[in-house]
């Protein structure tokens, strides 16, 4: 639902930073304990990135995109903690994530959105199976609180896993997976559960307000203790976070400070739960093993579609920087066919996987239990698979159009060296209309994004974030209606015979492997999207500045501000 004129009670980036000072988590980074996450230098790029999601929601220009009205409360909330109720919501979420990732590379807070939408779906599913509203009521009470307080939630999903060939209950070390160790605990007069175990990869863990603990796989009956979904404050007793720095803050390398990742980056943390108490009000399920797979599937589908937008924002950075580098080198891609081909390939890759995200929104449909909207899983997984494998081509193209200068430049200290600076500025200038300083600044920017630590980091999170390529291929095959295509050809070949003796389509055989998957609607009015359903909500003050709609020249104008 699009935002109305309700005045949002939302935090700014500074408010967010101040709120972190009120939290006292047990966090370690670089071998030492952190006194204040908000003031820890190693986390500043990550805090800056999340902070942008707060400031953009308060800007008149972006508020219609970055905020929405929560249909269960009527309150204006940040888009990244909102439950989707239409294809328009899915599209606006996609545009919002692309917008913030153009600026930050990875804004991280969008994981909150993906998790709350998945938990809403599984809560309603459990209630429908039991004929109650208990789980939905409990989750909505929690959701409204975190929306009203404008909190950012981390997703603690990926367990340490131990021996990958064994299921959770078969592990020699039970703490390889987070699990329930006590179901009837009482703490300060409040009833709840106690959990222990390890979540190995938690995005932005140190500077989250709370963690959403979720199972990372399908569970069997024997794994019931490991089937737990709950919310844990970041400074809950018994929770320890062992983190890595976000970006490259203050790092002094032989080639100088990182132009992008000194400002924006992402920390991750290993989260160790040692008998952490969770009140029942914050427990969304505990022991309902048969629903773990559905939660994992729902979250993965939401998250893979969202990742499409995040990496499209990164693609925008490479397109703009690549064009600037061509210009600085004295080339016009419009005249140089080999550069034009490379730039068009980069544009095609970026907009190609983004189009899959758009299609996943358009063909999205209401979940049968919660009635909230779910992206189409086929297009969501195809788009994520494309970006996961094409990220390396995106880097290659940036390297091709830029030239070797991006990794061979002397360090920036030489720019100010009276013995070398003036001469370097003379001999390393190419296009007479582009100052030497701008050329080398753009080169170092591209190096930071593609050829250094940060470039490798973007490659790995693109490949494995949200699940491995093998997992995406499995979901594509599982959900794609191959059976419809088989039956189409069977009909054209007149292999089926109707009761009256006329040619007919071969009957669907549930036992036949290649016709198992059948799905109407990709090309008919009775499919996933009902005719007349709003696809894109009206955003008159924003639509001309949506990240996927900006003219090329205008999109390039903002880039030097990042350098």
Walk through the language-model features, giving the residues of each.
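Basic/polar N-terminal segments that are highly enriched at the extreme N-terminus
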Residues: 1-18, 497-563
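N-terminal-proximal low-complexity accessory segments that begin disordered
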Residues: 5-54
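Internal helix-loop-helix
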Residues: 55-153, 204, 210
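Gly/Pro-rich turn-and-neighbor structural signature
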Residues: 124-196
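A short core secondary-structure module
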Residues: 202-252
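Glycine-rich beta->alpha junctions and the first turn(s) of the following alpha-helix
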Residues: 254-349
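Long, well-ordered mid-to-C-terminal structural blocks that present hydrophobic/aromatic surfaces
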Residues: 314-317, 321-393
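Alpha-helix capping/hinge segments and adjacent helical runs
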Residues: 378-523, 538-540, 547
């Amino acid at each position: 639902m699009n935002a109305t004129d309700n005045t949002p009670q939302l935090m700014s980036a500074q408010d967010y930073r101040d709120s972190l000072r009120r939290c006292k988590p047990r966090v370690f980074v670089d071998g030492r304990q952190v006194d204040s996450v908000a003031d820890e230098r190693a986390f500043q790029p990550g805090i800056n990135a999340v902070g942008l999601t707060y400031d953009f929601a308060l800007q008149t220009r972006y508020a219609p995109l970055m905020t929405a009205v929560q249909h269960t409360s009527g309150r204006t909330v940040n888009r990244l903690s909102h439950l989707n109720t239409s294809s328009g919501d899915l599209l606006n979420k996609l545009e919002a994530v692309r917008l913030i990732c153009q600026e930050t590379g990875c804004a991280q807070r969008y994981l909150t959105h993906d998790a709350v939408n998945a938990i809403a779906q599984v809560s309603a599913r459990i209630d429908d199976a039991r004929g109650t509203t208990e789980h939905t009521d409990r989750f909505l009470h929690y959701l409204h609180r975190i929306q009203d307080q404008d909190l950012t939630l981390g997703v603690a999903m990926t367990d340490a896993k131990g021996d990958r060939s064994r299921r959770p209950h078969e592990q020699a070390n039970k703490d390889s997976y987070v699990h329930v160790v006590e179901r009837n605990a009482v703490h300060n007069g409040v009833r709840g559960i106690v959990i222990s175990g390890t979540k190995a990869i938690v995005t932005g863990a140190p500077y989250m307000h709370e963690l959403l603990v979720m199972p990372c796989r399908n569970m069997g009956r024997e794994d019931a203790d490991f089937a737990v979904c709950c919310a844990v404050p970041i400074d809950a007793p018994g929770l320890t976070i062992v983190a890595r720095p976000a970006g490259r803050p203050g790092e002094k390398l032989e080639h100088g400070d990182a132009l992008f990742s000194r400002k924006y980056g992402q920390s991750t943390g290993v989260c160790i739960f040692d008998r952490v108490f969770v009140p029942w009000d914050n427990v969304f399920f505990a022991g309902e093993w048969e629903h773990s797979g559905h939660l994992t599937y729902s979250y993965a589908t939401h998250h893979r579609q969202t990742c499409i937008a995040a990496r499209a924002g990164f693609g925008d950075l490479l397109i703009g920087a690549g064009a600037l580098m061509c210009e600085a080198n004295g080339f016009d891609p419009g005249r140089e066919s080999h550069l034009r081909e490379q730039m068009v390939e980069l544009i095609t890759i970026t907009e190609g996987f983004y189009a899959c995200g758009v299609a996943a929104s358009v063909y999205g449909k209401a979940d049968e239990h919660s009635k909230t909207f779910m992206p189409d899983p086929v297009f969501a997984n195809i788009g994520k698979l494309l970006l996961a494998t094409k990220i390396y081509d995106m880097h290659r193209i940036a390297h091709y159009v830029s030239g070797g200068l991006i990794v061979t430049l002397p360090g920036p200290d030489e720019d100010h060296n009276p013995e070398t600076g003036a001469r370097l500025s003379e001999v390393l200038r190419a296009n007479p209309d582009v100052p030497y300083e701008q050329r080398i600044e753009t080169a170092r920017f591209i190096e930071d994004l593609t050829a250094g630590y940060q470039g490798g980091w973007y490659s790995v999170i693109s490949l494995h974030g949200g699940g491995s390529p093998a997992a995406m291929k499995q979901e594509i095959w599982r959900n794609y209606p191959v059976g419809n295509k088989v039956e189409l050809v069977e009909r054209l070949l007149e292999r089926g015979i109707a009761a009256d003796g006329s040619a007919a389509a071969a009957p669907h055989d549930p036992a036949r492997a290649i016709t198992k998957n059948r799905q109407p609607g990709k090309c008919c009015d009775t499919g996933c999207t009902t005719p007349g359903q709003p696809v894109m909500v009206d955003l008159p003050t924003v639509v001309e500045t949506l990240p996927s709609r900006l003219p090329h020249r205008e999109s390039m104008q903002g880039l030097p501000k990042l350098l």
